[in-house]
Amino acid sequence: MSRSRINGNFLDKTFSIVANILLRIIPTTSGEKEAFTYYRDGMSAQSEGNYAEALQNYYEAMRLEIDPYDRSYILYNIGLIHTSNGEHMKALEYYFRALERNPFLPQAFNNMAVICHYRGEKAIQQGDSEIAEAWFDQAAEYWKQALALTPGNYIEAHNWLKITGRFD
């Protein structure tokens, strides 16, 4: 039985039902359908905190998925898992790869900025203000890109940019 079918979450069930209907009525290849099934199962496992299973499903979806736009979301979700696991450099790599395929993912820019800001805070704690400033400058660039794509979102980031004098 597919993982998403046993998930008790109402939203996941609703998503699965709608997705299954769309897969039946929209002309897609069997490979595309299989890729989406792995992606959907990956999201289900991820929402339950089962990151190892989610990654297995996402990697299989990546093997099958050919559409760059769809691949960007798979890569983004892999980045989320690495972020959750504290593997920040690996997460940044996956966010970059997602943005190469879809440069209109403000959430990827935001997550990259959050990681850079976190690394800047860690550098301050270690007494390295020069490294901290470099991380903060990079965070600012990513937040500016996220804000350019979605004006009005990321209000805390917008305020931080203003307070720190990094907003143009």
UniProtKB/Swiss-Prot annotation:
SUPFAM superfamilies: TPR-like. It holds the Pfam family TPR_1. It is a peripheral membrane protein. Keywords: Membrane, Photosynthesis, Plastid, Repeat, TPR repeat. One of its GO terms (cellular component) is plastid membrane. The keyword Plastid applies. GO terms for biological process: photosynthesis. TPR repeats lie at residues 35-68, 72-105, 120-153. It is found in: Plastid membrane. Essential for the assembly of the photosystem I (PSI) complex. May act as a chaperone-like factor to guide the assembly of the PSI subunits. Belongs to the Ycf3 family. This is Photosystem I assembly protein Ycf3. It comes from Cuscuta exaltata. The gene is ycf3.
